[in-house]
Each structure stands twice: as C-alpha cells, then as structure tokens.
From Swiss-Prot:
Cofactor requirements of the protein: Mg(2+)
Residues that bear Phosphoserine: 107
Positions of the catalytic residues: 107
Protein name: Phosphoglucosamine mutase
EC number(s) stated in the UniProt entry for this protein: 5.4.2.10
Gene source species: Burkholderia multivorans (strain ATCC 17616 / 249)
Chain sites annotated for binding Mg(2+): 107, 246, 248, 250
The gene coding this protein: glmM
C-alpha cells in the first residue's frame, strides 16, 4: 500500500489545509515519538531526543509548538535549534548523537506552504519502512505519557555557530577566500544567520541579500528559484561570483561575474572534473531524469559512468549508495557529495565549487568549456489533486508528436511533482524554439484534458 502522507521530501502542503494543520502535526509528533521510543538506541532509563529546526515562515512557530507537544506526549525529549538550514539539522542530529532530526520547511515553496521532514540518527532521510511505521501510528489514539514520563524541551545553545564551523571544516585548510567578492543570497530563509558568516570567516568580501526574513517573504523574488535578483546584484557590485540558496538552503545556484547562471547539472560536472584532477579518477556520478543530455555526454567523454535516478534528491542518494559513488546532483541545485555530508547542502556545495576553482585556477566558464547545454523548456501545469492525465489520448498524442519530431535530437519528460499538485512538462532540444514549441503544445493538451 502506498504512503498516505509522506511524499518524496516529507509531508508538505498549504498551512491550514490537511495535513498541515496543528492537530495533525501534533499527532505526527506523537506518532514519530512512539516509533522512536521503540527503535532508538538510548541508554537504559533514558529518553530519545530529537532536534527540531525550521525555516523562517510565520507558520513555523505554530508547527514547532505542535510537534514539540506531540513528542513530549510520547515521552521524547526535544531540542530546539530555531531557524536552521535543513542540512544543518542533519549534521547536528548526527554530531550530537540524537535519535532523530525534524525540519519544518517547505523548501523552495512560497510562504503559505510548509512541511515536515525527518532525519534518522545518522543524518539521512528516513527509510520508507520507518515512514510507514509513523503513518501506522497516526491511526492509533493518542495516549499521553504519565507526568513523570513526559518529554522535556530546551533550546540548543549556539546551533548556528556549530553548523558554521562544520561548513568551514569542509573547505581545504590550505585555501582561503581572501580577495574574492561574493554576493550571497539567502532567500530570506533558514540560512540568513549562517551562510554570510561562513564565507566571511573564510576571508571573502561578502555582500548579503535575502537576509531580512519577516515570515512572509521567503523565496519571494530571491534565492535559488528566483536568481534574477542575484544576477543583478553581482553585476551592480562588480562581484566575482554570486551564490544563491533556497529557503532551507539545500539547493545551490551560482552566478559568475558576467551574470551567467550555473545550475546543478553544470556544477556537478565541475565537481567531477575537480575530483578527476585530484584523485585521478571518478568511477561514476548520478543525475536525474531531468539532467541535461549535454552533461551526460560530457561526463561519459571524460570516462565517468553516468546513471539517471528518479527526480528527487532521496533517489539520487539511493543510486549513489547502490553504486558506491560520491557525487550526484539535480539541475535544481541539490548537490550530494557523500564524503562531505549525508545530504544535499547548498553552503557546503558552494565551498566545494570554490575549492575546485582555487585548485584549477580557472573560472566556471573555463571549467565548462566545450559543454553546451541543450535548451530545456520546463512548464509546470497546476492540476487538481488526484487529476488523471496518464490515460488521456490527447495528452498522449501531443507527447508522441513531440517525440517523433525530436527523434535522436532531444527528449520529452512528463512527471507529476512529488511535492506540489503540478505536472512538470520538460522538453529538451538542440534548438530553444523547438523545445518551447513542443513543451507549450503538451502543456496546453494537459490543461485541456484536466480542466
């Protein structure tokens, strides 16, 4: 049986609509606490402890309180990190030997949305069977622990400082960032107190933007999903590079001095090239169904195996573990380097790219010389939840028409989002006009068939 609540990245939705309601989130905390109480590795007589972090959405306060109450009712102690990047929660959970970590965030989504995602004690996303166990507990009545068995809550001292030091530790000790002017866009999100300090403490001249969260402006015209603000700031300040994170700082996009934007596909290629230069060989790397065909060709030309996973960083991670490889990425900016962190980390990924540039003495454009991305057109078609599109003859006809026209020179990919009620229509072609024309035709067929 499929999961009812957990998607590809936890549980997510619009605040106030099921399941992102205070009563459900309280029960979710209780259910997760009961599962942890039965599986956590703790000393006899001790209680499991979970860490809760959040991004800057106004609803985070409400959902944090609900989660805290649920865990306490289940007899689980809680540590509160406050605003903290998703990868920061993963790191601190592992470093502090806690039973689990929880992030309250909807990542790149607008502020009316929010979500809950969990990390296991080792800083990895929960396996499917644990999520299924939590869902099973949601069907059971909430039976509060007796007063002497309730969990306690406390703030984690200097959570931001601990994570800042971890990020800096991933940058080579022989290098620094002196002489480099960086614009750092934190999307008014979870990294606003962290990211500028990391790059500044390594020596960079940092110009921060997107660092004034008010509860309502996360990802609003800033960050990795809206890079125009960063591109303008880089040019206006004559900066060397710009770094864009998303609302929970697990995604990365980079802008160079000319204003050119580099996505996760291109940054993966840069990191693979750096590993080849330092280690002599990279056996393989993982992308997704959305990874640009030009990057796959370039990696194979460099002698690197390339495997495509389903879209979602958890699936990239699964493929990396399956093959025993280190590097993987999504074009959206989730970049995994498993010898540095257990999950995608926008700040750490930026430091890895900066280290690659330092070692090579090249610019990003020079490191990507000869790699010309195929134009891609991505259209998100909003649909009613549960709308059926797979059996539509008109949609199938539009897809087949595009595939026939692009045979051997492009790709068509249609998939439902795992986090939003949208159908993603992606067409890749050698000519941008062809990609746009076919994507728009398919999107219009979807709209007509699912109206």
């Amino acid at each position: 049986m499929g999961r009812r609540y957990f998607g590809t990245d936890g549980i997510r939705g619009t605040v106030g609509d099921a399941p992102i309601t205070p009563d459900f989130v309280l029960r979710l905390g209780y259910a997760a606490g009961k599962v942890l109480a039965g599986t956590a590795d703790v000393a006899p007589g001790a209680r499991p402890t979970v860490l809760i972090g959040k991004d800057t959405r106004v609803s985070g306060y409400m959902l944090e309180a609900a989660l805290e109450a649920g865990f306490s009712a289940a007899g689980v102690d809680v540590m509160l990190a406050g605003p903290m990047p998703t990868p920061g929660v993963a790191y601190l959970t592992r470093a502090l030997r806690l039973s689990a970590g929880v992030v309250i965030s909807a990542s790149h989504n607008p502020y009316p949305d929010n979500g809950i995602k969990f990390f296991s004690a080792d800083g990895n996303k929960l396996p499917d069977d644990t999520e299924a166990a939590i869902e099973a507990w949601l069907d059971k009545p909430l039976e509060c622990a007796p007063s002497d068995g309730l969990g306690k809550a406390r703030r984690l001292d200097d959570a931001a400082g601990r994570y800042i030091e971890f990020c800096k530790s991933t940058f080579p000790a022989a290098f620094d960032l002196r002489g480099l002017k960086l614009v750092v866009d934190c999307a008014h999100g979870a990294a606003y107190q962290v990211a500028p300090h990391v790059f500044h403490e390594l020596g960079a001249d940092v110009i921060p933007i997107g660092v004034a969260p008010n509860g309502f402006n996360i990802n609003d015209g800033v960050g990795a999903t809206a890079p125009d603000a960063l591109m303008r700031a880089v040019r206006a300040n004559r900066a060397d590079l710009g770094i864009a994170l998303d609302g929970d700082a697990d995604r990365l996009q980079i802008v160079d001095a000319s204003g050119r934007l580099y996505n996760g596909d291109e940054l993966l290629y840069v990191l693979v090239q750096d590993r080849i230069a330092t280690d002599g060989k990279v056996e393989g790397a993982v992308g997704t169904l959305m990874t640009n065909l030009a990057v796959e060709v370039a990696l194979q030309r460099a002698g690197v195996q390339f495997v495509r996973a389903a879209v979602g960083d958890r699936y990239v991670l699964e493929k990396l573990r399956e093959h025993g490889w280190q590097l993987g990425a999504e074009g959206s900016g989730h970049i995994l380097s498993l010898d540095r962190h257990s999950t995608g980390d926008g700040i750490v990924s930026a430091l890895l790219v900066l280290a690659a540039l330092k070692r090579s003495g090249k610019t990003l454009a020079q490191m990507l010389d000869g790699v010309t991305l195929f134009p891609q057109k991505l259209i998100n078609v909003r649909m009613k939840p549960g709308a059926d599109w797979k059996d539509s003859a008109s949609i199938r006809a539009a897809i087949e028409t595009a595939e026939a026209a692009l045979a051997g020179s492009g790709r068509v990919l249609i998939r439902a989002s795992g986090t939003e009620p949208v159908l993603r229509v992606m067409v890749e072609a050698q000519q941008a006009a062809d990609a746009t024309r076919h994507a728009e035709a398919i999107a219009e067929a979807v709209r007509a068939a699912t109206a």
